[in-house]
Amino acid sequence: MSIAAERKAEVIKTSANKPGDTGSPEVQVAILSERIANLTAHFKIHTKDNHSRRGLLKLVSTRRSLLDYVKKKDEARYKALLEKHGIRR
């Protein structure tokens, strides 16, 4: 499930390093975390929706790859991201 354009803009604004920053790993992780949270809520109602569950696993995998990249580049940014978004690792 996607997120509304207004919500996505809000997430980008709160996670951006500078104005107009939409591609940094921090912003991408924030957007993916929002989409993952939406899908998790969706699965509480629609437990047998296995097609969307596959999409969720792809999102989680993509987020993990981005987090691995951030961890490799800067451990402090990585830990801040985990804490900010409440990601267990």
UniProtKB/Swiss-Prot annotation:
GO BP terms, alphabetized: translation
Keyword Nucleotide-binding attached: no
Region Disordered: start-end pairs: 1-25
Annotated Gene Ontology cellular component terms: cytosolic small ribosomal subunit
Keyword Zinc: no
SUPFAM superfamilies named among the record's database cross-references: S15/NS1 RNA-binding domain
SMART domains in UniProt: Ribosomal_S15 (SM01387)
Subunit (UniProt): Part of the 30S ribosomal subunit. Forms a bridge to the 50S subunit in the 70S ribosome, contacting the 23S rRNA.
Protein name: Small ribosomal subunit protein uS15
Source organism of the structure: Nitrobacter winogradskyi (strain ATCC 25391 / DSM 10237 / CIP 104748 / NCIMB 11846 / Nb-255)
Source organism phylogeny: Bacteria, Pseudomonadati, Pseudomonadota, Alphaproteobacteria, Hyphomicrobiales
Gene of this entry: rpsO
